[in-house]
Curated annotation (Swiss-Prot):
InterPro entries: CybS, SQR/QFR_C/D
Membrane topology: Multi-pass membrane protein
Subunit structure: Component of complex II composed of four subunits: the flavoprotein (FP) SDHA, iron-sulfur protein (IP) SDHB, and a cytochrome b560 composed of SDHC and SDHD.
Residues in compartment: Mitochondrial intermembrane: 81-85, 138-154
Gene Ontology CC: mitochondrial inner membrane; respiratory chain complex II (succinate dehydrogenase)
Domain of life: Eukaryota
Mitochondrial matrix-side segments: 107-115
Protein's name in the database: Succinate dehydrogenase [ubiquinone] cytochrome b small subunit A, mitochondrial
Organism field: Danio rerio (Zebrafish)
Pathway: Carbohydrate metabolism; tricarboxylic acid cycle
Keywords, in A-Z order: Electron transport, Heme, Iron, Membrane, Metal-binding, Mitochondrion, Mitochondrion inner membrane, Transit peptide, Transmembrane, Transmembrane helix, Transport, Tricarboxylic acid cycle
Protein family per UniProt: Belongs to the CybS family.
Length: 154
């Protein structure tokens, strides 16, 4: 009842409730427009994981999201048609996804020039070892798809 009294007081003042409006609210964008960004700011203050690759941060972010969607699509593919192509694709996609994810954590929490360089070398070595380990497993054992099936069997 109190909410009805409150709504009636709002309507008396000439305002329409937001939920009953048929027009969309027009707010300012949370992101600046393309022409409003100052690209002359020193890059030392901006932490982007893609600074070494030469692509913009938005393209890098888009690539990460595409890779996440590809991984989601690989789950049914691995179940429906397991094989070497899917095994090696999953190995590559998991390695890239993990590399980018841990790289973002390192970007956020590792500070100092020497520590950042050591962290980048470490993540590169870890990602390389992960990829070659998964490829070794795919080549010399049953493969990732069949290994997951074996884990879920009784």
């Amino acid at each position: 009842m109190a909410s009805l009294i409150r709504l009636s007081s709002v309507w008396q003042r000439g305002m329409r409730p937001v939920l009953l409006c048929h027009t969309q609210l027009s707010r300012g964008s949370a992101c600046p427009r393309i022409g409003d960004v100052d690209y002359t700011e020193p890059a030392g203050r901006i932490h982007t994981a893609s600074s070494s690759t030469g692509i913009s941060a938005s393209q890098h972010w888009t690539g990460e999201r595409v890779m996440t969607l590809v991984l989601l699509g690989m789950a049914p593919a691995a179940y429906l048609c397991p094989g070497p192509v899917v095994d090696y694709s999953i190995a590559a996609a998991l390695t890239m996804h993990g590399h980018w994810g841990i790289g973002q954590v390192l970007t956020d929490y590792v500070h100092g020039e020497v520590k950042i360089k050591l962290a980048k070398v470490g993540i590169f070595l870890l990602s390389t070892a992960t990829f070659f380990g998964l490829c070794y497993f795919n080549y010399n054992d049953v493969g990732l798809c069949k290994a997951v099936v074996m884990l879920w069997q009784k």
